[in-house]
């Protein structure tokens, strides 16, 4: 069974309403047959799960979908089992993966999506779709059991990617931090996914959506820039992906 994923860099662009830039793509991706959506708000920290879920619920209602937030149901495992789509919101990646491990939902979600159920994630929700969360930008505010993610794609994502250099700032750039990761993880690609872009994965095809380019990093290689019309299918070339 093939996987279907829509992995967003971010939820909101400057000057826009929440998830505005992604709404039509989300609707196109889910289609008209999806009715039961499971939403996971575990990345929320400064906001309550309830407040966060209602914010996301409004967006999905506006485009014709209802969903159940996982913290409100009696059995989170049953919710995932019966879901027709899984949506994982952004926030703090370490808190998100901690809660997914703690609730023992990682295997449930992985199995569900591996059997064809659509998965949508933004920011932290895209991070956890990767083999690990090691390319997150977030502060490790909590120690998870493991950095292992859902392993739904065979590459890493760095959401909110920017190659901007802050004047008079001597800290590491994003690219330098990713280079550190690659030294210790030389066999995996990292996709620098700028805000306002997303990756749509269906079967053995992957497509960049948005009006910006992405950057691809691999140990020992020059970073490569890819445009929305470029073929990225090679990123999915892993025997165990499907």
Curated annotation (Swiss-Prot):
Pfam families: Peptidase_S51 (PF03575). The active site is at 123 (charge relay system), 138 (charge relay system), 160 (charge relay system). It is found in: Cytoplasm. GO terms for cellular component: cytoplasm. Gene3D superfamilies: 3.40.50.880. Its EC number is 3.4.13.21. Transmembrane segments: none annotated. GO terms for molecular function: dipeptidase activity; serine-type peptidase activity. Keywords: Cytoplasm, Dipeptidase, Hydrolase, Plasmid, Protease, Serine protease. Coiled coil: none annotated. It catalyses: Dipeptidase E catalyzes the hydrolysis of dipeptides Asp-|-Xaa. It does not act on peptides with N-terminal Glu, Asn or Gln, nor does it cleave isoaspartyl peptides. One of its GO terms (biological process) is proteolysis. InterPro entries: Class_I_gatase-like, Peptidase_S51, Peptidase_S51_dipeptidase-E. Its main location: cytoplasm. Hydrolyzes dipeptides containing N-terminal aspartate residues. May play a role in allowing the cell to use peptide aspartate to spare carbon otherwise required for the synthesis of the aspartate family of amino acids. Belongs to the peptidase S51 family. HAMAP family: Peptidase_E (MF_00510). This is Peptidase E. It comes from Nostoc sp. (strain PCC 7120 / SAG 25.82 / UTEX 2576).
């Amino acid at each position: 069974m093939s996987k279907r994923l829509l992995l967003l860099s971010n939820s909101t662009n400057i000057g826009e309403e929440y998830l505005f830039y992604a709404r039509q793509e989300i609707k196109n991706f889910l289609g008209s047959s999806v009715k039961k959506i499971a939403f996971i708000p575990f990345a929320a920290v400064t906001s309550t799960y309830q407040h966060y879920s209602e914010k996301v619920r409004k967006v999905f209602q506006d485009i014709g979908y209802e969903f159940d937030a996982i913290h409100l149901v009696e059995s989170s495992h049953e919710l995932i089992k019966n879901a027709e789509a899984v949506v994982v919101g952004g926030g703090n990646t370490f808190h998100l993966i901690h809660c997914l491990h703690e609730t023992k939902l990682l295997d449930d979600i992985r199995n569900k999506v591996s059997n064809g159920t659509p998965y949508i994630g933004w920011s932290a929700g895209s991070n956890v779709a990767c083999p690990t969360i090691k390319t997150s930008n977030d502060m490790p505010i909590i120690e998870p059991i493991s950095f292992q993610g859902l392993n739904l794609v065979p590459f890493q994502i760095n959401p909110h990617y920017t190659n901007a250099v802050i004047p008079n700032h001597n800290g590491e750039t994003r690219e330098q931090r990713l280079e550190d990761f690659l030294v210790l993880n030389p066999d995996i690609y990292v996709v620098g996914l700028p805000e306002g872009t997303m990756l749509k994965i269906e079967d053995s095809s992957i497509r960049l959506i948005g009006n910006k380019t992405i950057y691809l990093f691999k140990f020992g290689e020059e970073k490569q820039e890819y445009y929305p019309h470029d073929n990225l299918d090679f990123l999915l070339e892993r025997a165990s992906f499907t």
